[in-house]
A protein has these predicted regions:
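Extended, folded cores of ATP/NTP-driven motor/assembly subunits in large transport
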Residues: 1-444
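Glycine-rich phosphate-binding loop of nucleotide-binding enzymes
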Residues: 60-76, 84-86, 91-105, 197, ...
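Short, flexible loop/turn elements at secondary-structure junctions
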Residues: 85-87, 117-119, 175-179, 375, ...
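Conserved nucleotide-binding/hydrolysis micro-motifs of P-loop NTPases
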Residues: 86-88, 119-121, 180, 515-517, ...
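P-loop NTPase motor domains
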Residues: 94-106, 298, 313, 397, ...
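Short glycine-/polar-rich loops that comprise or flank the Walker A/P-loop
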Residues: 108-111, 506-507, 527, 712-714, ...
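P-loop NTPase motor core of the ASCE superfamily
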Residues: 159-167, 471, 549-601, 724-726, ...
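Anion (oxyanion) recognition and catalysis
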Residues: 201, 392, 503, 523, ...
Length: 845
């Protein structure tokens, strides 16, 4: 750690060759020194954070440890940035990031990048709950979900499977320069910061300066992690008149030294360093540092920090060193001895490559890669074993930093890997010399996608990242979506989650269904259930509700009339012209009182016999026709709720009528969306859309409606069981192709092949593997692949027992809730009581 300790931590003190004192059971000198330090001083004395200049936003550091001569206290200055981890990378990103080395750094400067898997998700959960309407059942559902997820931040959320923790990945990027700066140095530092932020931005990492309150909160998390079941609800208060180090560490922090780790509260902190690297690596592969995407057993079972510390060497001195070492290694590799020692040949080849890189202008840097684990007490060995297995599966070898835990722990704190600590690492031979290209490709800047900005849906990634999903956050296109989910994969739960999220945050939702899948949930949530039966007395005359007779309205009315005339086949342009003439004429004459009867009469009086035939075909929908009661007179279809389910099951045997009813309902919903507030979310869900959209004239209607609702802040969401369902008719295909969002739950192989053949979006080898790996764990979660403008991600919908009861389709559970409500329970309390009774019966109470 510190230069004065170099003599105390030599190879003779390592576990492999302990000295006599160690063999007698006494602690090694390094542990003894720190143990003695912690008896008299706190951890704060080992931190260098001194002050912050609000004008320049630079940090000034000075190490204040008691065993350092006050006249020799190492000083540094610099800045700390936070960047959002990227969910992926390519060669172009790596090339852009390489630009960070095209700067003129003072010799000895350090760059540090830390990726922190933070368990502090309480703030995100609170934002999600807080977005729900206060006192509603939706708020209760959100709170129960949040409570459930918060249990999975320190220990696995699922007891009978591999470790799964819920997290929020954060990434910091720091540059520290040696010495006490003058005005010129400060000016250079500010220029460097601007340049680095520009490089990061160009690579897809918009950076922000970490101000003292945020730094104190982050350091507090790392040096004083919350106990299991608790969270950091209060951030440390920043006082510009008190050294930062003293504000960063609570006086209650009790740090204990162990041979292979530290103990802080109920955490057994353990630090590891990279001992050997894979022969080939790319930046995109660093996303596996947080856990294997495909193998559940290769995960990190606790909070952790993955760090790269980079020391900027003297370029000329480094080149001389490379030339010297390369010549020796190459000479040895060419010697007769190398025939018997293959390692010498490999070493020679490696140094020849380094020499060639340097000769071609590629610069070198000295780096350290480390991982700090934060397992619960008693679980450190297990966590160490699992993270070693993860890294080894990728070609990296990790080793525990025995007797060097404090130094490694400090190096994993944001901005703490400074020029002085880097020099100590160099003295202990802990820095590797590699090309700057390799530095960039091993930076821990990748994690899982954290979603969109608004807290609508809340999912979590396979490696635990909590993510918000909101289709209405799409600034690049429309808000429409398509859901593809095979039987048993959790489609109803997922659609219910979308609908309850929209309604719970103050929006409106309509569900058009055949099969009564949403009847019980609708009634349980106090929604409006509209059933189209012979005796329902519902009138849906489309003319009654027209407010503005614009081009879009006319287009959709034409498609409705055309659907009634030719439910399966097509209609030529001439016939569509006659329909338009009829609609325009009757609207001018009767306005909102117009009906299908008026359209039919107009066509029957037309001189062309083909138009007359069309009038005859419309007879079933006129006042004397079999379906006239649905269309004659004023529309009685009203939407009196924020959640409306329209059930078309009874029309299933009357396909020609069902197709017209669907189009009129969609038109009516669009009109409601138009009347609503633009900033209020509005969504219409059509389940088993391919079957409902089988009408021959629906395609143009769908295209117009999908485009139209975007202007009203509305969205359509269709759902089918397989991709090829969307290709069973032109209207369903139009819905598929006009949806910017695609949600794919578990699929059969043939459905994935259909997706690939459709060209809807590119499905290469990797994405194909991702889609085939999508799974549903009953009682645990449903996975969904989310495709949106700009990329894709996998999220898990994890449902708590309370929400599961709300979404239940079991008649006995709905009946039980209704009985409790009749006894005076609120709806939210009734569901709560049902969950309590079930839990009690499980435990025999």
């Amino acid at each position: 750690m510190l230069a004065k300790l170099a003599a105390l931590i030599t190879p003779k003190n390592r576990r492999s060759t302990p000295d006599a004192n160690v063999l007698r059971g006494e602690p090694p000198p390094s542990i003894a020194v720190f143990s003695e330090h912690f008896k008299r001083y706190g951890l704060a004395d080992l931190l260098h954070y001194e002050s912050f200049d609000p004008e320049t936003q630079l940090y000034y550091n000075s190490l204040n440890a008691a065993f350092i001569n006050p006249k020799e206290r190492p000083k540094s200055y610099g800045f700390i940035l936070e960047i959002p981890p990227s969910p992926g990378a390519d060669e172009e990103m790596a090339k852009i990031l390489l630009g960070m080395f095209n700067q003129h750094y003072p010799t000895g400067s350090t760059i540090q990048c830390c990726l922190y898997a933070s368990p502090e998700i309480a703030g995100m959960c609170q934002a999600w709950v807080g977005a729900r309407q206060s006192g509603s059942i939706y708020e209760r559902m959100a709170q129960r979900r949040a409570d459930y997820l918060l249990k999975g931040t320190r220990r696995s959320l699922f007891k009978d499977s591999a470790a799964y923790l819920v997290r929020d990945y954060r990434c910091t990027f720091a540059l520290m320069m040696p010495g006490n700066p003058d005005d010129s140095d400060i000016s250079d530092a500010l220029s460097l910061r601007d340049s680095l932020m520009g490089v990061l931005r160009a690579a897809g990492f918009p950076a922000r300066v970490v101000a003292p309150p945020d730094l104190l909160a982050l350091v507090d998390e790392l040096v004083s992690p919350a106990r299991e079941g608790d969270f950091k609800h209060l951030k440390p208060q920043y006082d510009a008149h008190v050294p930062l180090r003293e504000q960063a560490v609570s006086r209650e922090v009790n740090l204990q030294m162990k041979e292979d780790g530290l103990v802080i509260g109920d955490k057994a902190v353990r630090c590891l360093s990279v001992n050997s690297y894979p022969k080939e690596w790319s930046l995109a592969m660093t996303r596996d540092f947080i856990g294997d995407f495909f193998q559940e057993t290769l995960q990190v079972p606790c909070a952790f920090v993955s760090t790269i510390g980079i020391q900027i060497p003297d370029r000329e001195a480094m080149q001389r060193m490379v030339t010297l070492k390369a010549s020796r290694a190459i000479q040895t590799a060419d010697s007769p001895m190398a025939k018997f020692l293959p390692d010498l040949l490999n070493r020679g080849r490696e140094w020849r490559k380094v020499q060639d890189d340097v000769d071609s202008g590629i610069s070198l840097a000295r780096v350290w890669h480390g991982v700090t684990l934060y397992p619960q007490l008693g679980l450190a060995d297990q966590a160490e074993s699992q993270v070693k297995s993860l890294y080894l599966s990728k070609g990296w070898k990790l080793e525990v930093d025995r007797f060097l835990q404090v130094q490694s722990f400090l190096a994993g704190l944001p901005g703490r890997f400074d020029p002085h600590l880097a020099q100590d690492f160099a003295q202990f031979k802990r820095l590797r010399t590699i090309t700057q290209f390799n530095v960039v490709n091993t930076m821990p800047v990748l994690a899982e996608w954290s979603g969109t900005a608004s807290p609508l849906l809340m999912l979590s990634g396979r490696r635990g990242q909590l993510m918000f999903i909101d289709m209405f956050d799409n600034n690049q296109g429309n808000y429409n979506g398509a859901v593809v989910a095979s039987s048993g994969s959790g489609k109803s739960f997922f659609l219910n989650e979308i609908v309850s999220s929209v309604v719970g945050t103050g929006g409106r939702a309509w569900i058009i269904d055949v099969g009564r899948s949403y009847e019980r949930t609708c009634k349980l949530l106090g929604g409006q259930f509209i059933e189209f039966t012979e005796n329902a007395g519902i009138n849906i005359n489309p003319f009654s509700t027209i407010r503005e007779f614009d081009d879009d309205e006319l287009t959709m009315l034409k498609q409705i009339v055309a659907q009634a005339i030719a439910s399966e086949g097509g209609i030529d342009d001439l016939s569509m012209s006659w329909i338009e003439q009829a609609i325009t004429s009757v609207w001018q004459d009767k306005g909102n009182t117009a009906t299908f009867t008026d359209i039919a009469q107009f066509l029957l009086t037309h001189p062309d016999h083909r138009a007359k035939d069309m009038g005859e075909i419309l007879f079933p929908y006129t006042k004397n026709g079999v379906y006239g009661r649905f269309f004659e007179g004023k529309s009685t279809l009203t939407f009196d709720n924020d959640l409306i389910v329209l059930e078309l099951e009874e029309l299933k045997s009357k396909k020609e009528l069902q197709g017209i009813v669907l189009l009129i309902i969609m038109l009516r919903i669009q009109q409601e969306m138009y009347l609503g507030e633009r900033n209020r979310r509005k969504i219409c869900v059509i389940d088993e859309a391919w079957d409902l959209m089988s009408g021959g004239q629906a395609t143009k209607f769908i295209e117009t409606g999908y485009r139209r609702v975007r202007k009203y802040g509305g969205a359509f969401l269709t759902a089918t069981q397989a991709v090829n369902d969307y290709y069973k008719n032109p209207a369903a295909q139009a819905a598929w192709e006009n949806s910017d969002w695609v949600f794919m739950l578990r699929q059969k192989d043939e459905s994935i092949e259909q997706l690939k053949a459709s060209g809807r979006f590119s499905v290469g080898e990797y994405l194909g593997r991702v889609l085939r790996s999508i799974r549903t764990r009953h009682g645990g979660y449903s996975e969904v692949y989310i495709h949106m403008p700009g990329g894709g991600a996998v999220g898990r919908l994890i449902v708590d027992s309370y929400t599961a009861k709300v979404y239940s389709t079991k008649a006995e559970e709905v009946h039980a809730v209704n009985q409790l409500v009749a006894r005076g329970y609120s709806l939210a309390d009734a569901v709560e009581e049902l969950v309590r009774q079930e839990e009690a019966s499980k435990h025999g109470h």
